[in-house]
């Protein structure tokens, strides 16, 4: 692991964009796991700008939505789905066959997790994951706790 220390949010966003574009340059068909929230927003904007200059770089990669709030409609503006479609998937015009997304209101949340796991089992591992750390230390929907849970889970 390499730790990068950046002096500002803009510098962090630029560095993250450089890492993602470098990885895409080496492996265009990679799977990128995308988080939502304040941390990655500027990086997504920079990637969209880069895609206007180098569209071929973004022509094969797959986006996996990291997580989703349960029990609300997918078109609700507060979903991770809405965020990713507004800031990343939509502006990059990622086709549905290269966008893997949890449903926000499945009848069976465990079956939905299994559906995503089966897709990943077929496709292969995640190549790069974009994560931020929330103000209280949370990562994704994993709130601070005495231990980490390594298996997939549904949070309601």
Q: Which sequence ranges carry the predicted segments?
A:
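N-terminal glycine-/serine-/threonine-rich phosphate-binding loop
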Residues: 1-32, 110
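Ligand-binding beta-strand-loop-alpha-helix segment within the catalytic cores
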Residues: 56-128
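Short Gly/Thr/Asp-enriched flexible loops that form oxyanion-binding sites at enzyme active sites
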Residues: 43-49, 139-150
